[in-house]
């Protein structure tokens, strides 16, 4: 069976996923598209040679009789309504982050999915599909380094634009760590604090950069995450797990080691899309396979809710300077195991 997908949102991310579905992945095809800018939708159909209907409204895509699953890559504040509509129609939906712009919105999706009685939602957190993170989790789960005690992490971007604001260090950047570190450790966060080192001269006047986020998990694991979005030298993701009897480190992406002109060097990537391109492929293929097999296994609506609650606490911590509690609702039995 070829899964027939409707895509809502044909901007950069939407078109990148359309490219995957059309040229890279197997078992699916795009049969419907929509974008707030009709020309964007037409351009996507032309560029990728789609045999797809262009709809003027995203809800029409959800309701279309030939659409079996929905891909939501539209503007963030529209995600909640489209995901809820897909659940109401009983159609599986892959939603790029954020699942909703508030924790309350995420909880409405959780409640709708639980009421439906079957998992329909996968959230677009791709790092759990990165082979480096998967290898790191295998080491942690094996017990080889003992119980994790501390994590030292960094998320560095070469630079960001003028529109990037201090809170976006949490909602656009740290959000990936909030998801993947919770997945690595298999437990929720208990508190968050944000501290500000000396500001880099490369940051815009309105942006606090770098920032250090301090997290504590329910069992007492301490995590520090450096967010430095104007580091200048490249795109660099680091994660070191300190255990009771050893240390495990996220491997850097493969790169040629160069010895030349009395120097030894390794190239560092500058683009986040290049760093995680394979992960995007794997996560979307997992969604296709999960729908076809009748069981989604990727990041759930509950994972989207958990990330939103933690992000809200981190933003409060940015503003208060205090240690902020991270209080989540009780996890429904629907999402356990």
Swiss-Prot record:
Top-level taxon in the UniProt lineage: Bacteria
EC numbers on record: 1.1.1.18
Top-level class of the enzyme under EC nomenclature: oxidoreductase
One GO MF term: nucleotide binding
Keyword Cell division: no
Pfam families named among the record's database cross-references: GFO_IDH_MocA (PF01408), GFO_IDH_MocA_C (PF02894)
Subunit organization: Homotetramer.
PANTHER family (UniProt xref): INOSITOL 2-DEHYDROGENASE, PTHR43593
Family from the record: Belongs to the Gfo/Idh/MocA family.
UniProt-recorded name of the protein: Inositol 2-dehydrogenase
Organism, as annotated: Burkholderia cenocepacia (strain HI2424)
């Amino acid at each position: 069976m070829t899964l027939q997908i409707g895509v809502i949102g044909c901007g950069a991310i939407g078109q990148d996923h359309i490219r995957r579905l059309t040229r890279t992945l197997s078992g699916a095809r795009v049969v419907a598209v929509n974008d707030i800018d009709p020309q964007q939708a037409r351009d996507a159909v032309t560029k990728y040679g789609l045999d797809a209907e262009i709809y003027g409204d995203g809800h029409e895509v959800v309701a279309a009789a030939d659409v079996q699953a929905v891909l939501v890559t539209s503007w963030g504040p529209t995600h909640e309504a489209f995901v809820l509509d897909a659940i109401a129609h009983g159609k599986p939906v892959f939603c790029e982050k954020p699942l909703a712009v508030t924790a309350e919105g995420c909880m409405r999706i959780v409640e709708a999915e639980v009421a439906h009685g079957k998992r329909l939602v996968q959230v677009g957190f791709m790092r759990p599909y990165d082979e480096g993170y998967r290898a790191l989790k295998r080491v942690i789960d094996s017990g080889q380094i003992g119980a994790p005690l501390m994590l030292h992490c960094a998320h560095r971007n070469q630079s960001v634009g003028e529109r990037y604001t201090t809170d976006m260090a949490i909602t656009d950047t740290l959000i990936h760590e909030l998801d993947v570190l919770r997945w690595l450790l298999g437990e929720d966060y208990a508190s968050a604090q944000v501290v500000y080192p000396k500001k880099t001269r490369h940051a815009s006047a309105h942006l606090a950069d770098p920032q250090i986020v301090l997290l504590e998990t329910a069992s007492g694991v301490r995590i520090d995450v450096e967010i430095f979005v104007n580091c200048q030298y490249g795109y660099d993701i680091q994660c070191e797990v300190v255990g009771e009897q050893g240390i495990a480190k996220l491997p850097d992406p493969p790169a040629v080691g160069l010895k030349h002109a009395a120097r030894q060097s390794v190239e560092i990537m500058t683009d986040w899309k290049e760093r995680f391109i394979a992960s995007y492929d794997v996560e979307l293929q997992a969604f296709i396979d999960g729908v076809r097999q009748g069981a989604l296994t990727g990041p759930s609506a509950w994972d989207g809710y958990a990330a939103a609650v933690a992000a809200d606490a981190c933003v409060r911590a940015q503003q208060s300077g205090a240690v902020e509690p991270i209080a989540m609702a009780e996890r429904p039995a629907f999402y356990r195991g």
